């Protein structure tokens, strides 16, 4: 019965994703309930992988006509070459090819040179076209070639200089990671009457080359691949079949009765009078519907919203195929000892 070591652990049935101000770049991803201690274990591991191991595109070197090294200045260009290199490092790129690719930037002043003015190939996308690279005065010209490559993590400029580098090639510190920021915290959440389960909240910000939820999925897959080598056994086929037969197609909390919620007498009576038996019945109600319930006020509404939030649920949810025909049997299976 070795499979009981992982089958009996509490785990979330799905992730709750809340987009940030820029949905393509920012999101808060909530996973719960988790066994006590697993929030910290998973949060720290996922954060480290997100920041260090995801593949991305970055400029690895540049060549500017008339410039021999990065400590030069260009006539008519307000920024010196060092500042231009720093601005190029901060560009966000997305590339669909493996090998190095070259881009070209041509500009004539007076103008503000932005990333959107770069001539890219079909397999390179500039994700922040408004990003400023430099400013040209009247009569100034800029002709630059940029080399883009795929990689992971941070690679210093010294490693981006080819052995046969031509005179004037300026290597650039490459920040390949598409993930800009990751922060996590662990909160308590409740399952039934037990309140010391973990809830993991991941705040992820990317440069737009990959969405936050996809970045977390890739990080989890990397961890899965790395951990696979430590498993020195195969799960018995009977155990696999038993697991599939025992699967409950809903969040387990939805199958619990509202009687298990620690609500005030008024709130509990209102739910009972409205024939709300299971938490799955409750979460499909909207706030407006709840407030139309006799004797149910704003205080009771806030109380229920807080209790549901602790389980990663909320009012107004859409639950396909609810209620299941065998809801009583499914609910009883939750009460059965392992």
Curated annotation (Swiss-Prot):
DNA-dependent RNA polymerase catalyzes the transcription of DNA into RNA using the four ribonucleoside triphosphates as substrates. Its EC number is 2.7.7.6. One of its GO terms (biological process) is DNA-templated transcription. CDD domains: RNAP_alpha_NTD (cd06928). It holds the Pfam family RNA_pol_A_CTD. Keywords: DNA-directed RNA polymerase, Nucleotidyltransferase, Transcription, Transferase. One of its GO terms (molecular function) is DNA-directed RNA polymerase activity. Residues 1-24 are annotated as: Disordered. Residues 1-10 have a biased composition (Polar residues). HAMAP family: RNApol_bact_RpoA (MF_00059). Belongs to the RNA polymerase alpha chain family. The N-terminal domain is essential for RNAP assembly and basal transcription, whereas the C-terminal domain is involved in interaction with transcriptional regulators and with upstream promoter elements. It comes from Rhodospirillum centenum (strain ATCC 51521 / SW). Residues 250-338 are annotated as: Alpha C-terminal domain (alpha-CTD). The gene is rpoA. The lineage of its organism: Bacteria, Pseudomonadati, Pseudomonadota, Alphaproteobacteria, Rhodospirillales. Residues 1-234 are annotated as: Alpha N-terminal domain (alpha-NTD). One of its GO terms (cellular component) is cytoplasm. It catalyses: RNA(n) + a ribonucleoside 5'-triphosphate = RNA(n+1) + diphosphate. Homodimer. The RNAP catalytic core consists of 2 alpha, 1 beta, 1 beta' and 1 omega subunit. When a sigma factor is associated with the core the holoenzyme is formed, which can initiate transcription. This is DNA-directed RNA polymerase subunit alpha. Transmembrane segments: none annotated.
């Amino acid at each position: 019965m070795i499979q009981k070591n992982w089958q009996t652990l509490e785990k979330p049935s799905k992730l709750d994703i809340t987009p940030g101000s820029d949905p393509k770049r920012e999101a808060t991803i909530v996973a719960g309930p988790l066994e006590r201690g697993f929030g910290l274990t998973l949060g720290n591991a996922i954060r480290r992988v997100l920041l260090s191991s995801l593949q991305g595109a970055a400029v690895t070197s540049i060549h500017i006509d008339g410039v021999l090294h990065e400590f030069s200045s260009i006539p008519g260009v307000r920024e010196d070459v060092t500042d231009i290199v720093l601005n190029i490092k901060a560009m966000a790129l997305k590339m669909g090819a493996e090998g190095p690719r070259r881009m070209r930037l041509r500009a004539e002043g007076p103008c503000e040179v932005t990333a959107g003015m770069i001539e890219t190939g079909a397999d390179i996308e500039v994700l922040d076209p408004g990003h400023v690279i430099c400013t040209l005065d009247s009569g100034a010209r800029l002709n630059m070639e940029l080399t883009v490559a795929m990689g992971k993590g941070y690679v210093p400029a010294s490693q981006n200089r080819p052995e046969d580098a031509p005179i004037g090639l300026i290597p650039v510190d490459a920040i390949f990671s598409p993930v800009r920021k990751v922060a996590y915290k662990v909160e308590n959440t409740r399952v039934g009457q037990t309140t010391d389960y973990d809830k993991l909240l991941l705040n992820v910000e990317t440069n737009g080359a990959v969405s936050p939820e996809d970045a977390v999925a890739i990080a989890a897959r990397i961890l899965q691949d790395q951990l696979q080598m430590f498993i020195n056994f195969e799960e018995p086929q009977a155990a696999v079949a038993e697991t599939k037969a025992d699967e409950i197609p809903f969040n387990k909390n939805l199958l619990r009765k509202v009687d298990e919620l620690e609500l005030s007498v008024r709130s509990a009576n209102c739910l009972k009078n409205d024939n709300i038996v299971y938490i799955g019945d409750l979460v499909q109600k909207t706030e407006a519907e709840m407030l139309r319930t006799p004797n149910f006020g704003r205080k009771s509404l806030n109380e229920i919203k807080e209790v549901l939030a602790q389980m990663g649920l909320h009012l107004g949810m859409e639950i396909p195929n609810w209620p299941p025909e065998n809801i009583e049997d499914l609910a009883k299976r939750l009460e059965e000892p392992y």
